[in-house]
């Protein structure tokens, strides 16, 4: 009887702790479920930011057509990635760029918008464009887990485990 009381108390504790995590997740997913279901009725005006730059000669030499990497998808050279970070406040380190004969293209998807960087390999002209679709789009993308990164993936996993713990402890408490 003492052992049963111990397990019942432990189950109650796990149940209320997991319910707190579930409550946070359910609030977010409930609201974004409604916004996703009515996406066509929620007007959004994307904000687009565009910048044009010219690569310095020493960096242009890193991307000329005769300096292609062995694969058509490869990261930008480190010095070029550092320059992009300094000039545009955009971290492209480790991201694969599409290397064609004419240009380099780096896709930069993110929740609630997207961005891209294009560098003309002949002239060294660089174009950067960032689109922000607003906070509702941001939350909707979190709901779908689109372009959200490792931290959000971990949150989704923790939320799923908390839901399982909540459900299972609830069933055992009923027993």
Regions found by a protein language model. Name each.
Residues 1-48, 153-175:
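Internal alpha-helical transmembrane segments
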Residues 8, 70-71, 129:
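Charge-dense, low-complexity intrinsically disordered segments
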Residues 108-163:
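Extended, hydrophilic extramembrane loops/domains of integral membrane proteins
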Residues 41-105:
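Membrane-proximal low-complexity regions enriched in glycine and acidic/polar residues
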